Amino acid sequence: MSKIVKVIGREIIDSRGNPTVEAEVHLEGGFVGLAAAPSGASTGSREALELRDGDKSRFLGKGVTKAVAAVNGPIAQAVVGKDAKDQANIDKIMIDLDGTDNKSKFGANAILAVSLAAAKAAAASKGLPLYAHIAELNGTPGKYSMPLPMMNIINGGEHADNNVDIQEFMIQPVGAKTLKEAIRMGSEVFHTLAKVLKSKGMGTAVGDEGGYAPNLGSNAEALAVIAEAVKAAGYELGKDITLAMDCAASEFYKDGKYVLAGEGNKAFTSEEFTHFLEDLTKQYPIVSIEDGLDESDWAGFAYQTKVLGDKIQLVGDDLFVTNTKILKEGIEKGIANSILIKFNQIGSLTETLAAIKMAKDAGYTAVISHRSGETEDATIADLAVGTAAGQIKTGSMSRSDRVAKYNQLIRIEEALGDSAPFNGLKEVKGQ
């Protein structure tokens, strides 16, 4: 009943209006899995390759017909007849057939779409929700938790057309007792922030991930307006709501210095930028900082981990790119204490689960994440619950591509009840 009988790839549109790959995997018995690959804007240099056509006459070169052709041709031929329940085998077949270190022959976007679609089809054939199937693949059947959301309510950097350097300013509703309550709290702060920004004559247009993208006097001002909104919404900063940031520092790393336009083009060394961030953590209850330095600045990261690693969560995104080889090196060298998990950085479900396991086994936390280019595909919600990862980043309280994930989490929490606890701040490293 779980034998693959047909695989279909197609080019669809993501939340930025760019093409991406969608795959359908059909099994005996009529079971079907449908999944789409996301796409990043600020990308780590060591990510698996997202294959684009490069034909400027079509979608400005961003078409994915080559990746779709790989799905409909060699990938389909290789996996038809195979058992979709054997996820590791399906993924290995595709990876081996691609034969490159970074999936550049078929594209990580092609391989991932089929990998996730196969998992969804297998779950359907077993009569299980996707999160339950993922828990079984993870070797942790029946072990679930609801993730603490990091809600990106002010967008900067590569995710917005404004003068804010730091890419994401996030709130975490740690005072909530349930995921559903956390979403309500986040929504209330999000709408209150709009009023605060309007009262200051600032714009409330949103960026790629649904957060506001105003021009601000400095990076610290983003934290100040969020603090004002939290209070105006009736919550206590540090008790009900904590803060998190994604610096995406590789985006403003130039000639060995961190150059911040929002700070008057001031240039910082690794140590100076670490202390700049440390000062912000003393002013505001920031409990998590992602990519606080450039992905190649491992000496700087070692220093940053020494200074901040016992106090807050330091998440590696561009730093680790969901890659177990790189993560292993980071663990051995004591770099950061958490990993951001993005399916398409590595390109298959099996490799994603391996990265989560390696992180947890080493005492690192794992934060499940969307990309700035998303679709209505909500698989990351099931991944977060099915691996009991504990934390999720899936944008703000607007844009259907973001809200789709929150709504799926609401459904899952309703289905699982007490068997999927919401642990709040306990999930965050250092808290």
From Swiss-Prot:
GO CC annotation: cell surface; extracellular region; phosphopyruvate hydratase complex
Q: Name one GO biological process term.
A: glycolytic process
Q: Keyword check for Nucleotidyltransferase, yes or no.
A: no
Write down the top EC class of this protein: lyase
Q: Pathway it belongs to?
A: Carbohydrate degradation; glycolysis; pyruvate from D-glyceraldehyde 3-phosphate: step 4/5
Which metal ions or organic cofactors does this protein require, according to UniProt? Answer: Mg(2+)
Note describing how the cofactor binds: Binds a second Mg(2+) ion via substrate during catalysis.
Q: Which Cys-Cys disulphide bridges does the record give?
A: none
Q: What catalytic activity is recorded?
A: (2R)-2-phosphoglycerate = phosphoenolpyruvate + H2O
| Subcellular location field | Cytoplasm; Secreted; Cell surface
Annotated residues that bind (2R)-2-phosphoglycerate are located at Q167, K342, R371, S372, K393
InterPro entries xrefs? Enolase, Enolase-like_C_sf, Enolase-like_N, Enolase_C, Enolase_CS, Enolase_N
Q: Where does Mg(2+) bind?
A: D246, E290, D317
In alphabetical order, the GO MF annotations are: magnesium ion binding; phosphopyruvate hydratase activity
Say where the protein is mainly found.
cytoplasm
UniProt subunit comment: Component of the RNA degradosome, a multiprotein complex involved in RNA processing and mRNA degradation.
Can you tell me which family this protein belongs to? Belongs to the enolase family.
Q: Name the job this protein performs.
A: Catalyzes the reversible conversion of 2-phosphoglycerate (2-PG) into phosphoenolpyruvate (PEP). It is essential for the degradation of carbohydrates via glycolysis.
Q: What is this protein called?
A: Enolase
**Species assigned in the record:** Pectobacterium carotovorum subsp. carotovorum (strain PC1)
Q: What is the lineage of its organism?
A: Bacteria, Pseudomonadati, Pseudomonadota, Gammaproteobacteria, Enterobacterales
Originating gene: eno
